[in-house]
Regions:
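Acidic, glycine-rich loop-and-strand cores that form catalytic or ligand-binding grooves
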Residues: 43, 47
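Intrinsically disordered, glycine/charged-rich C-terminal tails and inter-domain linkers
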Residues: 49, 71, 76-77, 85-88, ...
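Catalytic core of nucleotidyl cyclases, primarily class III adenylyl/guanylyl cyclases
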Residues: 1-39, 49-103, 127-138, 151-158
């Protein structure tokens, strides 16, 4: 994994009498990687918005054949974001396999799978989170500190809250331009600034339930949980769950997951 202290270093350890070298790369030294990381998260969030705005998708979801007990079918997607090194195009001059070899590819897949467990649309590792701009980090939420299969290193995980049980306004091109809507959206992406996190209507509407009061209470609850003060953590996380009753899950997925973990180990 990426060094948490953001330094390039070589560690040596003795294994069966041999010296094994482990290298970590400081990705923060790559220019423009903060914007690239911001755009990666922003792109996935826009996908979440569009599956709740597109007329064809909405019509498909409301079809009677897919209804269950009178409720419309829900379409949900999960995304995992991680950053690290990888080897591309493995092979020889005669044949190249267009694939990637890296443990970091597997880490992204595990984050995507864990997004369902935590009931969130996006799950990020600390390695990815630390590459983003301060503005993007400020609107994300730390959920837990976990270890994943294949790694013994505990790491924080983060999400951007998405309230999907709502209608998003239709996108229309301004009347005073000859550009198509697709061209305008591409231009907007090319001209990205960190102001998007506090001005973009879709993003603000998407995280509408994650109020400052909710974020502060969840932060206090997760800190109590990590400090093994589970009685206090239960009280705070139960309150957080109630504050998210209007969400498509009928509560807060991360709070429910952690409450379930504590309940099974009480």
């Amino acid at each position: 994994l990426i060094d948490n202290n953001a330094r390039k270093r070589i560690q040596s350890q003795q294994s069966d009498g041999e010296t094994v070298h482990h290298a970590s790369v400081n990705l923060k030294r790559i220019p423009g990687l903060d914007d690239l990381s911001d755009k990666a998260l922003l792109g996935f969030l826009k996908v979440v918005v569009e599956i709740n705005r597109d007329k064809q998708v909405l019509a498909y979801r409301s079809g009677k054949r897919l209804q269950h007990e009178g409720h419309d079918f829900q379409l949900r997607m999960g995304f995992g974001l991680h950053a690290g090194w990888g080897m591309e195009a493995v092979g020889s001059l005669q044949k190249v396999d267009a694939t990637y070899l890296s443990p970091h590819v597997n880490m992204s897949a595990r984050m995507e799978a864990a997004s369902r467990q935590f009931g969130v649309a996006v799950l990020m590792t600390e390695s990815f989170f630390e590459l983003m701009s301060n503005e993007a980090q400020s609107v994300c939420r730390r959920l837990d500190i976990v270890t994943v299969k294949g790694s013994a290193q505990p790491m924080p995980i983060y999400t951007y809250d998405t309230f999907q049980n709502q209608e998003f306004p239709e996108l229309l091109a301004p009347k005073n331009t000859d550009l198509s809507l697709a061209s305008l959206l591409k231009k907007q992406a090319d001209n990205y600034t960190t102001r998007e996190w506090t001005t973009d209507r879709d993003l603000l509407q998407l995280r509408g339930l994650a109020t400052p009061a909710f974020n502060e209470k969840f932060k206090e609850g997760i800190n109590a949980y990590l400090a093994a003060n589970w009685a206090k953590a239960r009280q705070l996380l139960e309150e957080c769950d109630k504050m998210m009753e209007k969400s498509d899950r009928g509560g807060d997925g991360p709070s429910q997951t952690i409450l379930g973990y504590m309940r099974n180990r009480a």
